[in-house]
Amino acid sequence: MAGSSTGGGGVGETKVIYHLDEEETPYLVKIPVPAERITLGDFKSVLQRPAGAKYFFKSMDQDFGVVKEEISDDNARLPCFNGRVVSWLVSSDNPQPEMAPPVHEPRAELAPPAPPLPPLPPERTSGIGDSRPPSFHPNVSSSHENLEPETETESVVSLRRERPRRRDSSEHGAGGHRTGGPSRLERHLAGYESSSTLMTSELESTSLGDSDEEDTMSRFSSSTEQSSASRLLKRHRRRRKQRPPRLERTSSFSSVTDSTMSLNIITVTLNMEKYNFLGISIVGQSNERGDGGIYIGSIMKGGAVAADGRIEPGDMLLQVNDMNFENMSNDDAVRVLRDIVHKPGPIVLTVAKCWDPSPQAYFTLPRNEPIQPIDPAAWVSHSAALTGTFPAYPGSSSMSTITSGSSLPDGCEGRGLSVHTDMASVTKAMAAPESGLEVRDRMWLKITIPNAFLGSDVVDWLYHHVEGFPERREARKYASGLLKAGLIRHTVNKITFSEQCYYVFGDLSGGCESYLVNLSLNDNDGSSGASDQDTLAPLPGATPWPLLPTFSYQYPAPHPYSPQPPPYHELSSYTYGGGSASSQHSEGSRSSGSTRSDGGAGRTGRPEERAPESKSGSGSESEPSSRGGSLRRGGEASGTSDGGPPPSRGSTGGAPNLRAHPGLHPYGPPPGMALPYNPMMVVMMPPPPPPVPPAVQPPGAPPVRDLGSVPPELTASRQSFHMAMGNPSEFFVDVM
């Protein structure tokens, strides 16, 4: 086999590059004839080949596209294709078998004995090697009967072994066919042949070239009247016959390679009378070698394709009705598909199934991640490695990935997520980008809260990702503990957990134990009957509340060696001497707010902290008591209900913390004076301006201003704010 290419040299000169037989090195000659007037006789006069040589030239056919045309008339002009003339020369130096008539004559004689082949498993089939999509002629009865169950490497080796025999005994000058039965290559490639087409080794040898130009374009002989299945077959065999480096290069031209796409062809007939639309989006693939086919991008619910169920995202669209997409550009294919859909009647879609028809079964996409049409295999492998829910028992490597670069102590890392894991590690895992918790900007009262999440989402995440919760209510208590520990924060410092409120992550840079110093899981978590009691942590520099008595005390100064300043709820626990309060049973009528008859706590109203620990007695001072190292928040009610005199100083439940912070001395109200109860007022009880120096104000507190100097309209605004905070769930509306 030989090939030649001519290009304009000088004026009136044509360069001829030809390949002789199977030689890899081309030859170059110059013919002093313009390219538009060069004839076969001019070509022969320069080459001076024997008379038995056959010449094939590349030309364009209206029905088949690029073909190889045999020219035997010396006066015939050589076809010009894209400004060049391409030719293949088959020499008659080798012994040639008896000449056979053209292909279309023996087709009728040889077709009946060829029985249809049994179907082969799709997973053993070969892949698509060219950048153009595969297609099959409508006359081919079953397209996946034409596939050969052998690997690509085996095919290359076997074809290379048979090349000398084919050159010695099976090739002839005209590219015709043997009359003594199929050659060994025919038997070797019989799986590709159907009863309506006949491909012999001799013709195959004329279309199998090792040149780079053949690597770029497919060439076929116009005398064979091949179907599109045979053209796909020829392209496929030519790819497998190439040398291994070229196989590797060819596989990189298209993202749809043998490992990602198999020739499992299905034909789906859709009855468009029952449905209003087809219901698919298509994606075109292109590369440096041209358009690479049309693929199913997504399937819409309610359409004809979704109702059928066999076509899935990632499938390659080969043919619609009788319109084949083999030699169409992507734009033409889209236009043809649009025209067919607008016409009445059923629609027949022929698609090549994806290597894995359901890649979405391997992973779950996050709710906000866009879906883009990509290679299905790369989609599966990449997403399976990077996407998915957080495992229930992550290994050490997974946990180290989540906490990588964090400032947590060594004791906080490498543990499984369970109820025994420290809360800081659980919160770090929950704050990871792929944890599954939906964290995004939220809108509340026309205010944007960045990186916020819903309380119910936190409870659900804890219940599904942290081991050890027998029921969801326990996960809710755990979430309340996260709020009290400062690992998650409410936007307005609300310390009672609610599933309808928005929260943000707190400071996760401290050590694990630093968050748990003041935490007690027995506190009111919002899941009991007091869940509707929305109490607020003290705001920095709270202004005085009107008409309340003032007492001589001061805020405790932060310890100079403390790793972090005490949180505001810890500061508020010293408001009345660490938790002393008068009995509310006898003095409840003096409350300006809602009256509590159960001896509630002064700040948070936790029922667990209402147990009487102070000793009642006139003028007696109770002994300090400790409760697990947690500070008493607000005032503790005395255990008496007979209206006896209140204790002069309540029990300070924060004795351990007082030892940890020397210099923090509680100061109580004057003995014998009952305090009017109101949860909000008790929390907001201010220090009088004279005895409070600026150095001992809470960190970050603004200048203290007496509310008496504030205009009445501003006072009403502050009261409205507290009323709104008393019913926060009515204002938290997610409008995103």
From Swiss-Prot:
Residues of the DEP domain: 433-507
Topological type in the membrane: Peripheral membrane protein
Biased composition annotated in UniProt, kind: Pro residues: 112-122, 558-568
Consequence recorded when altering Y295F: No effect on interaction with FOXK2
Occurrences of domain DIX (ranges): 11-93
Biased composition, class Polar residues, residue ranges: 218-230
Residues found modified as Phosphoserine: S211
Required for interaction with FOXK2: region residues: 250-355
GO CC aspect terms: aggresome; apical part of cell; clathrin-coated endocytic vesicle; cytoplasm; cytoplasmic vesicle; cytosol; lateral plasma membrane; nuclear body
Recorded consequence of changing S251A: No effect on interaction with FOXK2
Record's keyword terms, sorted: Cell membrane, Cytoplasm, Cytoplasmic vesicle, Developmental protein, Isopeptide bond, Membrane, Nucleus, Phosphoprotein, Ubl conjugation, Wnt signaling pathway
Record keyword ATP-binding present: no
Biased composition, class Low complexity, residue ranges: 193-208, 581-598, 614-629
Consequence when changing I282T: Found in a renal cell carcinoma case; somatic mutation
InterPro entries for the chain: DEP_dom (IPR000591), Dishevelled_C-dom (IPR024580), Dishevelled_fam (IPR008339), Dishevelled_protein_dom (IPR003351), DIX (IPR001158), DIX_dom_sf (IPR038207), Dsh/Dvl-rel (IPR015506), DVL2 (IPR008341)
Major subcellular location class: membrane
Described purpose of this protein according to its UniProt entry: Plays a role in the signal transduction pathways mediated by multiple Wnt genes. Participates both in canonical and non-canonical Wnt signaling by binding to the cytoplasmic C-terminus of frizzled family members and transducing the Wnt signal to down-stream effectors. Promotes internalization and degradation of frizzled proteins upon Wnt signaling.
Assembly: Interacts through its PDZ domain with the C-terminal regions of VANGL1 and VANGL2. Interacts with Rac. Interacts with ARRB1; the interaction is enhanced by phosphorylation of DVL1. Can form large oligomers (via DIX domain). Interacts (via DIX domain) with DIXDC1 (via DIX domain). Interacts (via DEP domain) with AP2M1 and the AP-2 complex. Interacts with DACT1 and FAM105B/otulin. Interacts with DCDC2. Interacts (when phosphorylated) with FOXK1 and FOXK2; the interaction induces DVL2 nuclear translocation. Interacts with MAPK15. Interacts with PKD1 (via extracellular domain).
Domain remark in the UniProt entry: The DIX domain mediates homooligomerization.
The protein's name: Segment polarity protein dishevelled homolog DVL-2
Origin species: Homo sapiens
Lineage: Eukaryota, Metazoa, Chordata, Craniata, Vertebrata
Gene that this sequence comes from: DVL2
